[in-house]
Amino acid sequence: MIFDKGNVEDFDKELWDAIHAEEERQEHHIELIASENMVSKAVMAAQGSVLTNKYAEGYPGNRYYGGTECVDIVETLAIERAKKLFGAAFANVQAHSGSQANAAAYMALIEAGDTVLGMDLAAGGHLTHGSPVNFSGKTYHFVGYSVDTDTEMLNYEAILEQAKAVQPKLIVAGASAYSRSIDFEKFRAIADHVGAYLMVDMAHIAGLVAAGVHPSPVPYAHIVTSTTHKTLRGPRGGLILTNDEALAKKINSAVFPGLQGGPLEHVIAAKAVAFKEALDPAFKDYAQAIIDNTAAMAAVFAQDDRFRLISGGTDNHVFLVDVTKVIANGKLAQNLLDEVNITLNKNAIPFETLSPFKTSGIRIGCAAITSRGMGVKESQTIARLIIKALVNHDQETILEEVRQEVRQLTDAFPLYKK
């Protein structure tokens, strides 16, 4: 019987080897991809539970199948914890991803072809904020706003003037590669001025918002979307919040039956665990440590004139660095750092001149190293290791030194092998 095959290592050695290799990679590499984090064993246990067996189309108390009394408890726990965590009146925890959450929010607020003002991808926005290759850009008429050419920060007066000119039905705030705090109150004022809805995608900063170390968009946005991983440190999934009951009903209809069928109740259970973890007072210390570590790491680059820190600093978990003075492009930098077991990604910088497949910059985030227990000292050390590798990218002896120093750090701060 299939139930006898409970051990992946024995039943599927080929798959187990790949999983084990990834476990070793995470254990011994320094993870700086800003959209990644390290979940707790409790989150993984919930996601790997028998809840994966249960189909539950609909919502708690109103399902299309029987036998849902247990998953109703699970999903209700996730909903109530999300509401408490973010101070929202309504929460939908069924969205499979941040992209699904954004799609549902758009469906709830606007019609196909409507004009939307969103952050341009090159300035730090996300694919779902209107990229022409994404459903958002194909379905709606997106107009992109950028950052100031001098400060590389959002210019709210310029965004207001742009909103007046294009008269959007919806304004989208939020980013995937913007290192500064966003003034959601100003965005709401702009939206109100032109009679538009305001949607905030807080996927990257959700954990910081939950901990109260970053301003919350919930009091200002008509709808807030998020992922549940990244700084929130939960499973991969989506979340939608609102304080408007009428919009909550539209959101629920957009998620199911509009975009999805049965919810992933095992993932929702893992979300519930992550929300409980984030409600613990210790999570605020964790979130503040992310900000402290990111600032410390960014400062090392700011003090080295061979690199240019985009916008001059960071207020959150992420920052961008122009690396073209020391290496041809961000892609080469990413590949080189992979070789010394430091993982990050190439990233376009504002007013990029290179192709998106090469880029001038790299994006660095500190959520994952903070989850390992690393602090300001280690963050500064990692920055110096990155600089050492990039500046000496053709010196194998020096690159080997960096590999050894990386291994010393990861051994000192084990992930799951404790």
From Swiss-Prot:
Amino-acid positions noted as binding (6S)-5,6,7,8-tetrahydrofolate in the UniProt annotation, renumbered to this chain: 121, 125-127, 355-357
InterPro entries, A to Z: PyrdxlP-dep_Trfase, PyrdxlP-dep_Trfase_major, PyrdxlP-dep_Trfase_small, Ser_HO-MeTrfase, Ser_HO-MeTrfase-like, Ser_HO-MeTrfase_PLP_BS, SHMT-like_dom
Compartment(s) where it occurs, according to its Swiss-Prot or TrEMBL record: Cytoplasm
Site (Plays an important role in substrate specificity): 229
Catalytic activity: (6R)-5,10-methylene-5,6,7,8-tetrahydrofolate + glycine + H2O = (6S)-5,6,7,8-tetrahydrofolate + L-serine
Keywords from the UniProt entry: Amino-acid biosynthesis, Cytoplasm, One-carbon metabolism, Pyridoxal phosphate, Transferase
GO molecular function: glycine hydroxymethyltransferase activity; pyridoxal phosphate binding
PROSITE patterns referenced in this protein's UniProt entry, alphabetically: SHMT
EC number of this enzyme: 2.1.2.1
Cofactor(s) this protein requires: pyridoxal 5'-phosphate
Statement: the UniProt record of this protein carries the keyword Cytoplasm: yes
NCBIfam families (alphabetical): PRK00011.1
PANTHER family: SERINE HYDROXYMETHYLTRANSFERASE, SERINE HYDROXYMETHYLTRANSFERASE 1
Family: Belongs to the SHMT family.
Annotated protein name in UniProt: Serine hydroxymethyltransferase
Gene this protein is translated from: glyA
